[in-house]
Amino acid sequence: QLGKGRKLDDDVNVLLRFEGGAKGILHASQISVGEENNLNIRVYGENGGIEWHQKEPNTMLVKWLDQPTQLYRAANGYLGKNAAAATRTPPAHPEGSLEAFANIYKNFANHIRAINEKRKLSKDDPALDYPKIEDGVRGMAFIEAVVKSSKGNAKWTKLDV
């Protein structure tokens, strides 16, 4: 569905098939009345799922089959190294999208600093936790494949990257 003056859809539903056989659904909308940029991410598998809501950014829900939902909060000692490095506020203090982008810029700058200082970084160093050129190219290829599928009567379209 195209909004006035738009070149791409304001509202999309995409069926996905991943390598290994997993299937998914992506729903993205800029026209859901009352949502106010309410980004939600839910991923479900055979044994459980995870859920995150932009309006509650410090909380991640983990849902296992036949177990109670587990709630993880930012800035707590049980988080992994990269999650801890990305946390800028103490527990119970909300972080927002500005901090998320600041983390990307900080990690990129720290990576460049390490290169300039000829320091080797381990594969799991937080300084390497930022989107790479390949991620951007893959994202653009995904959008092109979705548009191609839409123009081709919504037929399955291979993502070539």
Residue locations for each model-derived region?
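C-terminal helix-rich "cap/oligomerization" subdomain common to oxidoreductases
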Residues: 107-161
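A broad, low-specificity signal marking well-ordered, structured residues that form hydrophobic/aromatic
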Residues: 24, 41, 157
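Glycine-rich Rossmann NAD(P)(H)-binding loop
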Residues: 27-31, 44-47, 160-161
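Alpha-helix N-cap/loop-to-helix initiation residues
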Residues: 32-33, 101, 139
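Beta-strand scaffold of nucleotide-dependent catalytic cores
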Residues: 25-28, 52-53
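C-terminal glycine/acidic-rich active-site capping loop/insertion
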Residues: 1-20, 41-42, 47-131
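Glycine-rich phosphate/pyrophosphate-binding beta-alpha loops
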Residues: 27-36, 93-97
